[in-house]
Amino acid sequence: KLILLFTVALMMQSCNITVEVSAYTDYDLTLEQKNNICWTSDTTSLIGLTNDGRIYAVNPNQMKDLLVAKEKALVYRWSPYEMENVIPIYFVQSYCNENNIELYVITNEYKSAFTEINNVKNPMFSMNIDDYITDISYKSENKFYKQLLGNKNKKKYHLYYFENGKCVRTEDKIVNEKKK
């Protein structure tokens, strides 16, 4: 009986691990990549983090605190699978550098994100799915962005412009800051 109980407990624990890893459908991450996903606690501050090659799983309140500390910031909701709206990360980073805007990329997919991580100045982020354990893909992403942006803004865009922590506009295309 003890062995059976231990086996069932181990299987249940394995299921929890699988849920976290498969939340972004990345069954084929290497051990090094899995170890480079940093699951932050609710109280972890993102201010002062540098791009150290890890992806930080964060909640909307952590992102809000980070954005308030920046005069101008751009949050890029990046997904390599949404081909019609994907803007190369290096292009968005270059645009931000030219316009004195801090870029923060939030990815919903890990495998491709690790190939892009060196193209951004700041750390790359993902949603901390522990807070959104329902339907991981669509509903949880909507809930995350609704909390980050407020009820008035929708997740349908990929670029979210912030000034001193306030979302001032959302778009799917890069706009020349000097001409707007």
Language model feature labels by segment:
Residues K1-L5:
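Sec-dependent signal peptide recognition
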Residues M11-S14:
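C-terminal motif of bacterial Sec signal peptides marking the signal peptidase cleavage site
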Residues N16-V19:
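Bacterial signal peptide processing site
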Residues Y24-T44:
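Post-signal peptide N-terminal segment of mature Sec-exported envelope proteins
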Residues I37-A73, W78:
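Post-signal-peptide N-terminal segment of Sec-exported extracytoplasmic proteins
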Residues M63-V92, Y104-I106:
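Short active-site neighborhood of thiol/selenol oxidoreductases, capturing the structured segment around
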Residues K111-K155:
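Thioredoxin-like thiol-disulfide oxidoreductase module
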Residues K154-E171:
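A short, hydrophobic beta-strand/beta-hairpin element that forms part of a small beta-sheet core
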